[in-house]
Amino acid sequence: MKIWNFGIIGAGLIADFHAKAIGSINNARLVGICGTNHEKALTLSKKHNCRKYDNHIEMLQSDEIDIVTIATPSGAHMEPAIEAAKYGKHVICEKPIEITLERIDKMIKAHQEAGTSLGGIFNFR
């Protein structure tokens, strides 16, 4: 069975929930976290026994990462999602996926062109 290696972009409260969820999946492994708040990212990386990346580009450049979870604040999902597509990474994005349809369309287009998957979180559903 393939083990999917995850990275989390964002180090706030929701990132900890995502890290716990990833840890509960048999064929998933959290390998890294990054965030603009480096102290929070370091704390989460220690808590979940994974690498702390300095930024999302460094994380996306890693061949070890298959999927990234975007757990940044609303309105800050498009850029890392498009960058992830450029690096061939699948994306699971916290809701709302973005704040305008135009921004969502750009994300969808980037992933269609890259042949990667883009999905949204629908917890408790």
Language-model features, listed with the residues they occupy:
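Short alpha-helical
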Residues: L13, E39-K40, G75-E79, I99, ...
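Short helix-capping segments at alpha-helix termini
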Residues: N26-N27, Y87, Q112-T116
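Rossmann-fold dehydrogenase core element
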Residues: K106-N123
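Glycine- and other small-residue-rich loops at beta-strand/loop junctions that grip anionic moieties
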Residues: A11, I70, P96, I121-F122
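Surface-exposed alpha-helical interface segments used for non-catalytic interactions
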Residues: K20, E102-D105, F124
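N-terminal Rossmann-like dinucleotide-binding module
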Residues: M1-H48
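Beta-loop-alpha module in the N-terminal Rossmann-like domain of NAD(P)-dependent dehydrogenases
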Residues: H48-A110
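Short, Asp-centered acidic motifs that coordinate Mg2+ and/or phosphate
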Residues: G32, D66-I67, S117-G119
